[in-house]
């Protein structure tokens, strides 16, 4: 297990960075041009997606050109003085910001200050060489990112979706435990909920990455259906997590359930947990009966509040009605997930 974990540290981007640096040095040596600036550019041009590599490469090239131009200009007039470094850095940053070349600001500034001490004469020639090395780094790293281990995030999205179903069920289980005990949600549950939200954001980011490179790779109809299904599932899981977060914020201590109400709620939550762990592939008839009972309870609490005439400000929803509303909302999301799953299975069977 530990060996697997150590090996996972060396991911695709790390390997691609090494390959890009290696090939960049070979190209620079072949054309007999300096390697250091090309290598720096190659390292920073490796992005999570091929699309980002191309877009940011097109930004970093003009940014580096600006940095090189300022470096050579100030070195020509002021020499290798401290003021040359400062002015080259300042003017490069300002120019990149004004021209909205934000992604290239850091590389351009590093290029500018690094060029000054190694250039003693032939400033225009040095400027042209710098353009060549920057171009080499961008082109090589973009090609490496595109053709070698091209980014495919579908498996990662699937893994995150599996984890989200399981961990969402676990948090629901922690919440029902707190409800039975009549105590507030534990600190650990709140932390688990935060981690769950981070996992969701990670999965959504992977979806965005996959969409960016969608046009560069061929996909079968089944792969496209699978991706779109997971995308829909993540959207609904996001809503479920939102409702669970609301549940975690309700004051459980103020709830006053009857024995039958508490029992129905517990059975419903346990049913929801089982459905989530089964990825919403099946919802039995017993679950719908429990939801019908819960729905009656919800409207009963609402009607009781409607007839209540307080002498001072009061909340329009009691803790009990909020909990019932959130649980019923989660059930609605589960039904949507089941429909998505059924549609995916049907399309795979007949297409």
Swiss-Prot record:
InterPro entries: ArAE_1 (IPR010343). The keyword Membrane applies. Keywords: Cell membrane, Membrane, Transmembrane, Transmembrane helix. GO terms for cellular component: plasma membrane. Pfam families: ArAE_1. Its main location: membrane. It is a multi-pass membrane protein. It is found in: Cell membrane. The chain crosses the membrane at residues 19-39, 74-94, 109-129, 131-151. Belongs to the UPF0421 family. This is UPF0421 protein BC_2748. It comes from Bacillus cereus (strain ATCC 14579 / DSM 31 / CCUG 7414 / JCM 2152 / NBRC 15305 / NCIMB 9373 / NCTC 2599 / NRRL B-3711).
């Amino acid at each position: 297990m530990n060996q697997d974990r150590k090996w996972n540290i060396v991911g695709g981007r790390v390997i691609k960075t090494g390959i890009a640096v290696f090939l960049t040095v070979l190209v620079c040596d072949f054309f007999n041009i300096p390697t250091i600036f090309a290598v720096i550019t190659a390292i920073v041009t490796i992005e999570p997606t091929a699309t980002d590599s191309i877009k940011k490469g097109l930004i970093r090239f003009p940014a580096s050109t600006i940095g090189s131009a300022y470096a050579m200009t100030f070195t020509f007039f002021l020499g290798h003085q401290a003021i040359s470094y400062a002015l080259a850095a300042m003017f490069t940053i300002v120019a990149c910001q004004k021209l909205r070349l934000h992604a290239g600001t850091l590389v351009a500034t590093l290029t500018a200050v690094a060029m000054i001490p190694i250039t003693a004469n032939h400033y225009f020639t040095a400027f042209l060489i710098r353009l060549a090395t920057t171009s080499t780094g961008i082109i090589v790293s973009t090609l490496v990112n595109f053709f070698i281990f091209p980014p495919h995030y579908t498996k990662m999205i699937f893994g995150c979706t599996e984890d989200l179903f399981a961990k969402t069920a676990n948090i629901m289980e922690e919440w029902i435990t707190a409800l039975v005990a009549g105590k507030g949600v534990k600190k650990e549950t709140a932390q688990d909920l935060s981690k769950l939200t981070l996992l969701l954001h990670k999965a959504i980011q992977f979806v965005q990455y996959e969409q960016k490179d969608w046009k560069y790779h061929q996909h079968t109809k089944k792969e496209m259906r699978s991706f779109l299904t997971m995308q829909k599932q993540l959207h609904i899981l996001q809503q479920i997590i939102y409702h669970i977060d609301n549940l975690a914020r309700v004051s459980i201590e103020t709830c006053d359930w009857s024995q039958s109400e508490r029992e129905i709620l517990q059975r419903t939550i346990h049913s929801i947990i089982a459905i989530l762990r089964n990825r919403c592939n099946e919802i039995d008839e017993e679950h719908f009966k429990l939801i019908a009972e819960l729905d009656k309870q919800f409207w009963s609490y609402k009607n009781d509040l409607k007839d209540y005439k307080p002498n001072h400000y009061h909340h329009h929803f009691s803790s009990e009605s909020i909990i019932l509303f959130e649980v019923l909302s989660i059930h609605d999301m589960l039904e949507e997930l089941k429909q998505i799953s059924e549609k995916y299975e049907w399309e795979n069977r007949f297409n």
